[in-house]
């Protein structure tokens, strides 16, 4: 769900930043675009690494659970903004960056996000009709988790504790 929710989040933030057209989500449709005022959320890379960290937490009913993080997932998207002038692209970029939150919630887990790099290009450097374009790499740092319920032992009785002076019992004695 991380990929889907992160993509939808970025599309929404592009609209908040002042994009008037529907954001593109594939490079093929973006390169075919004849618009000069353009925005896109394109898939980037995903890094996966094994992680074995554990934490114990209580749910809303008070039951304790152990959550194990099986994998780290770093999903990167490329957000493209294009416009006629540098000033308009920069204004849209600043609105977009200002609209970004610290992270998003995915399946009850907080997933932080970071804007990692920005690349500017002119019409000679990209296939868009826009005069100036900027590409921002946004990375979401999430994970794959497994929850296990913790059960407390109840109704147990200690029958007998025997001391054998350091000798091993023979035949249960």
Where are these regions (language model features)?
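Generic alpha-helical secondary structure
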Residues: 3, 7, 86-89, 93
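A broadly used, surface-exposed interaction patch
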Residues: 56-65, 79
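Small/polar-rich, solvent-exposed N-terminal microdomains that initiate assembly or binding
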Residues: 1-60, 162-173
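Oligomerization/assembly interface segments of phage tail-like spikes and tubes
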Residues: 67-87, 128-142
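A structural detector for beta-sheet-dominated domains
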Residues: 41-44, 116, 121, 159
């Amino acid at each position: 769900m991380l990929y889907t929710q992160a993509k939808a989040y970025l599309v929404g933030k592009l609209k908040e930043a002042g994009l008037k057209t529907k954001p593109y989500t594939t490079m093929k449709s973006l390169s075919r675009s004849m618009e000069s005022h353009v925005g896109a959320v394109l898939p980037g890379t995903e890094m996966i690494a094994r992680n074995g960290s554990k934490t114990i937490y209580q749910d809303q009913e008070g039951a304790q659970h152990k959550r194990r993080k099986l994998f780290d997932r770093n999903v990167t998207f490329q957000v493209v903004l294009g416009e006629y002038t540098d000033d308009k692209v920069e204004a849209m970029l600043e609105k977009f960056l200002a609209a970004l939150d610290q992270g998003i919630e995915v399946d009850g887990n907080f997933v932080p996000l970071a804007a990692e790099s920005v690349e500017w290009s002119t019409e000679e450097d990209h296939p868009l009709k826009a005069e100036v374009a900027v590409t921002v790499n946004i990375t979401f740092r999430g994970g794959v988790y497994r929850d296990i319920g913790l059960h407390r032992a109840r109704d147990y009785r200690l029958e007998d504790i025997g001391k054998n002076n350091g000798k091993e019992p023979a035949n249960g004695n």
